[in-house]
Amino acid sequence: MTQETALLSTSPEGGDLNVPARKVFVKTYGCQMNVYDSDRMSDALSRDGYVATDVLEDADFVLLNTCHIREKAAEKVYSELGRLRELKKAKALEGREMLIGVAGCVAQAEGDEILRRVPAVDLVIGPQTYHRLPDALKRARAGQRIVETEYAIEDKFVHLPAPDKAKTRARGVTAFLTVQEGCDKFCTFCVVPYTRGSEVSRPVAQIVAEAEKLVEGGVREITLLGQNVNAWHGEGPHGREWSLGDLLRRLGEIDGLARLRYTTSHPRDMDDSLIEAHRSMAKLMPYLHLPVQSGSDRILKAMNRRHTAAEYLALVERIRAAQPDLALSGDFIVGFPGETDQDFEDTLRLVEEVNYAQAFSFKYSTRPGTPGAELKEQVPEDVKAKRLEILQALLVKQQRGFAEACVGREIDLLLEKPGRMPGQLVGRSPWLQPVNVDAKASQIGDIIRVRITKAGPNSLFAEMIGESDARS
């Protein structure tokens, strides 16, 4: 099959099969949920005959799926839109049409302002309405300028296509699956409640059906996603209320699904059922991302976290008692308004006590529209930078220590992709570290037994000691 033939339209709506398919280029910013959303939007467009392209200049439609968490997120998007505007002009001079769309949390936050500032943009669509993207794009092609950012009454997941087996297989043996969206915690630094809305949980049957489709497409590991994933709840058999632990146990029953993970969690929603799942489920990987943000009770209160440092530490102790092999990850913000040297020392003390396998740390940045933006006593930038440097040095030391402690251990490794060297494959350890192994006789998707031989700065190295598992 020639490349031109491969790009012919396959629209189920009966388009001319001799007309080249339109191409869509999607650029994804930010979190894993945006990666999931981008895949689902691409799948939805494929029903109208669009094919994905990695070449920006070839695209008939360019979609930016944006993130609004970090400082100047919107300005970075506007900068990218300026470049796309020039590309759109150049293509128009050649008689080629290119539409531009903005999706995600910047779209939700900015709305009509995007069209005002960048008239070259054709459509703006929020994270709760992207199931309407195919229709919005048709209207944009007819000359309308579209803004779809209201919170939809209908369940968007009902209107999205099920995962396509061929596309799933092409995306790899690991997959994300959104089970929960939004957040009701209203931390004073965070925009999520304003861009993603209140907490909403997908129904059990819907989640299980999507997971089974992913496994049919060759997926062996699924990561459940949510802005506050452990707030998920739903109705189980006989009307019993289920929490995330129950859902994990149900997904663990799917034949062919070897591994489960979930992210991101809030300490206040780690219930007994979920902790028990960590103790009893072999398929649930011993890795937990549990952000705390600060080790100072005073700052935690100002952040509206609604827990203390001692309560967080007690929770960590309970989880580790249930799963002693657990690798813990966290998030930290330094320089929150009013943070003193003592507050920062309290954070360092908590980090020392927990001993993280991995963590993410950032300087506080004002997010317009959040309560934190109105707080006095903003910390000077040079103080933030110095504190971040100190904290990151400690976290890197802990991460290296955890990696070095893995040397000599024997683990099961899920092979995910080719390595840089001939015969080398790369997988993820149970604790989410990349692991390089010489495994010429194995293939992507196999789970093999390896011994860790070396810890590098960003990955581990291993030797194969066991045969690949049988694959159905």
Curated annotation (Swiss-Prot):
It comes from Rhizobium meliloti (strain 1021). Residues 22-142 form the MTTase N-terminal domain. It is found in: Cytoplasm. Binds 2 [4Fe-4S] clusters. One cluster is coordinated with 3 cysteines and an exchangeable S-adenosyl-L-methionine. The keyword Transferase applies. Residues 169-403 form the Radical SAM core domain. This is tRNA-2-methylthio-N(6)-dimethylallyladenosine synthase. Catalyzes the methylthiolation of N6-(dimethylallyl)adenosine (i(6)A), leading to the formation of 2-methylthio-N6-(dimethylallyl)adenosine (ms(2)i(6)A) at position 37 in tRNAs that read codons beginning with uridine. Its cofactor is [4Fe-4S] cluster. SMART domains: Elp3 (SM00729). InterPro entries: Elp3/MiaA/NifB-like_rSAM (IPR006638), Methylthiotransferase (IPR005839), Methylthiotransferase_CS (IPR020612), Methylthiotransferase_N (IPR013848), Methylthiotransferase_N_sf (IPR038135), MiaB_methiolase (IPR006463), rSAM (IPR007197), rSAM_horseshoe (IPR023404).
